[in-house]
UniProtKB/Swiss-Prot annotation:
Residues 11-21, 205-216, 250-261 have a biased composition (Polar residues). This is Uncharacterized protein MPN_502. Residues 1-21, 158-218, 246-271 are annotated as: Disordered. InterPro entries: P1_N. Signal peptide: none annotated. Belongs to the adhesin P1 family. The lineage of its organism: Bacteria, Bacillati, Mycoplasmatota, Mycoplasmoidales, Mycoplasmoidaceae. Pfam families: P1_N. Residues 170-199, 262-271 have a biased composition (Low complexity).
Length: 422
């Protein structure tokens, strides 16, 4: 039958689409204004689109003869929970698809909430689908090109020639703290940017063997950025931008008794607990579907699995343990050893907002390890109330969705980010 060879599937919409190679077992989907899966046959002919937002199992589509052309819950031995599962995933966006190598009609689709894609578009400077163009006056005019990309008009930066640093510094012999203000051009108060206030303490210098005065050592005592990570704000055009007052030094408006000037930790948009409590709404989902283009019930939903972030942190990678000092004098790196990483994706210095309030307490006075102790561990970022243990990482949706993917079929098992779902 013809449907034995019709096993190509792509994703795309309008003029943007990606053809799926039937010889491969997975393909990357593209996201645009409307999100749908596009079905192709081996000859490269587009057969139809599967737009989850427009499919309703309660009102199946019928042709002119009254025959049901789409019945997602008929045939293929589906479970009785399929209607409820469909309502949980119909408003989510497909971002990746993998074809079962043992069954040309069985596909696994990775779905994420639509708000996650919108947030990613905002981070990249892309406009939302319903966002109109915005324009200002004079040199501040902006244009919105394809896919809402905002591009500023090219203009010469005349302020670079007279750019200078102005500020106030106070120093003392036993310790010092400085607060500086950077101003471009030195004329307008609106261009002033508050610098981070960093308190340091100096150690007395030591003399070398030849009697020379030793170098003065300065070590970090506290850092406002570690205690109050950067917030993200949005203007009328929904552009994510950094504000000068977003370092958490402003008085707390929650009425919890926070003193003026005390840093208020940045709160993630969604915490691990929120995603865990409502995975149908906030979590990523895996949809297993059957699609036979020339069958009467061509598409059917097999099962739906929601990816719980707590399950991810409990099962993959192997451990959140802090790395140990090995016999080579190097730190053993594991995928989940994020508390000490300064270059990796899970990085408390690069993304301090991924750590809950109270976890971003840097221990800068202790080196944390001893070369003579092979079992020594470094605390790095730790909780104030439980300083003898390493702090677990919080996994809000930025880190959660950024590390989900790589759908791979292994015999009858489906692997997503190393987690076996079946």
């Amino acid at each position: 039958m013809r449907d034995n060879i019709a096993k190509g599937i792509t994703a795309g919409s309008n003029t943007q689409q990606t053809t799926y190679d039937p010889t491969r077992t997975e393909a990357t989907l593209t996201t645009a204004t409307t999100f749908a899966l596009r079905r192709y046959d081996l000859a490269g002919r587009a057969l139809y689109d599967l737009d989850f937002s427009k499919l309703n199992p309660q009102t199946p589509t019928r042709d002119q003869t009254g025959q049901i052309t789409f019945n997602p819950f008929g045939g293929f031995g589906l479970s009785g929970a399929a209607p409820q599962q469909w309502n949980e995933v119909k408003d989510k966006v497909p971002v990746e698809v993998a074809q079962d190598p043992s069954n040309p009609y069985r596909f696994a689709v990775l779905l994420v909430p639509r708000s996650v894609v919108y947030y990613e578009q905002l981070q990249r400077g892309l406009a939302l689908p319903n966002q109109g163009s915005s324009s200002g006056s004079g040199q501040q005019n902006t244009t919105i090109g394809a896919y809402g990309l905002k591009v500023k008009n090219a203009e010469a930066d005349t302020a670079k020639s007279n750019e200078k640093l102005q500020g106030y510094e106070s120093k003392s012999s036993n310790g010092s703290s400085s607060t500086s203000t950077t101003q471009r051009g030195g004329s307008s108060n609106e261009n002033k940017v508050k610098a981070l206030q960093v308190a340091v303490k100096k150690k007395s210098g030591s003399q070398g063997n030849s009697g020379d005065q030793g170098t003065e050592q300065v070590e970090l005592e506290s850092n406002d950025l570690a205690n109050a990570p950067i917030k993200r704000g949005s203007n009328n055009n929904q552009q994510v931008q950094l504000k000068a007052d977003d370092f958490g030094t402003a008085p707390s408006s929650s009425g919890s008794g926070t003193q003026d000037g005390t840093p208020t930790p940045w709160t993630p948009w969604l915490t691990t607990e929120q995603i865990h409590n409502d995975p149908a709404k906030f979590a990523a989902s895996i949809l297993i579907l059957y699609d036979a283009p020339y069958a009467r019930n061509r598409t059917a939903i097999d099962r739906v699995d929601h990816l719980d972030p707590k399950v991810m942190t409990a099962n993959y990678p192997p451990s959140w343990r802090t790395p140990k000092w090995n016999h080579h004098g190097l730190w053993d790196w594991k995928a989940r050893d994020v508390l000490l990483q300064t270059t990796g994706f899970f990085n408390p210095r690069r993304h301090p907002e991924w750590f809950d309030g109270g976890q971003t307490v840097a221990d800068n006075e202790k080196t944390g390890f001893d070369v003579d102790n092979s079992e020594n561990t470094k605390q790095g970022f730790q909780k104030e109330a439980d300083s003898d243990k390493s702090a677990p990482i919080a996994l809000p949706f930025e880190a959660y969705f950024a590390n989900i993917g790589n759908l791979t079929w292994f015999e009858q098992a489906l692997l997503v980010f190393g987690i076996c779902l079946s």
